[in-house]
């Protein structure tokens, strides 16, 4: 599982021109890719890292500040570009396996009291964000 965390001052995700999830203040935009073979252990690691990493201003975490998280599923994070000119997506989990794990990450963050908003799994989405820093870090579980 890969989670690309970007510190933002605001972010939103739209489907067919309609905003379906947004952060109106500071927080984290989390692009989440699920690999084939991922499970509960990877979910727990990503939830812990997203909630507890001190990546916000003043070395704060989202769990410690109440800042929100916008989670957007993105299978392309599992792409392999090591050969040729076209990425391979073979490492990505199939949608029927990935969706419950994305939902589990969202539920795990909410269980920790983190305000979470999301995109729509599998939809063609437009993601907008205003980066803060910029500060982006990759979590691999």
State the predicted function of each range.
Residues 91:
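An anionic oxygen-ligand recognition environment, strongly enriched in 2H phosphoesterase
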Residues 96:
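Short, surface-exposed ligand-recognition loops at beta-strand->loop->(often short) alpha-helix junctions
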Residues 1-88, 99-141:
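N-terminal, polar/charged subdomain of small-to-medium soluble alpha/beta proteins
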């Amino acid at each position: 599982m890969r989670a690309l965390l970007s510190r933002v001052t605001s972010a939103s995700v739209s489907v067919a021109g309609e905003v379906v999830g947004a952060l109106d203040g500071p927080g984290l935009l989390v692009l989440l890719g699920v690999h084939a073979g991922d499970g509960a252990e990877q979910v727990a690691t990503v939830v812990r890292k997203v909630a507890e990493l001190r990546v916000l201003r003043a070395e704060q975490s989202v769990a410690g500040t109440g800042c929100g998280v916008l989670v957007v599923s993105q299978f392309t994070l599992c792409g392999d570009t090591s050969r040729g000119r076209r990425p391979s997506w073979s490492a990505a989990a199939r949608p029927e396996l990935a969706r419950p794990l994305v939902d589990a990450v969202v539920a795990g963050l909410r269980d920790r009291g983190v305000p979470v908003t999301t995109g729509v799994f599998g939809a063609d989405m437009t993601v907008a964000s205003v980066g803060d820093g910029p500060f982006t870090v990759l979590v691999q579980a």
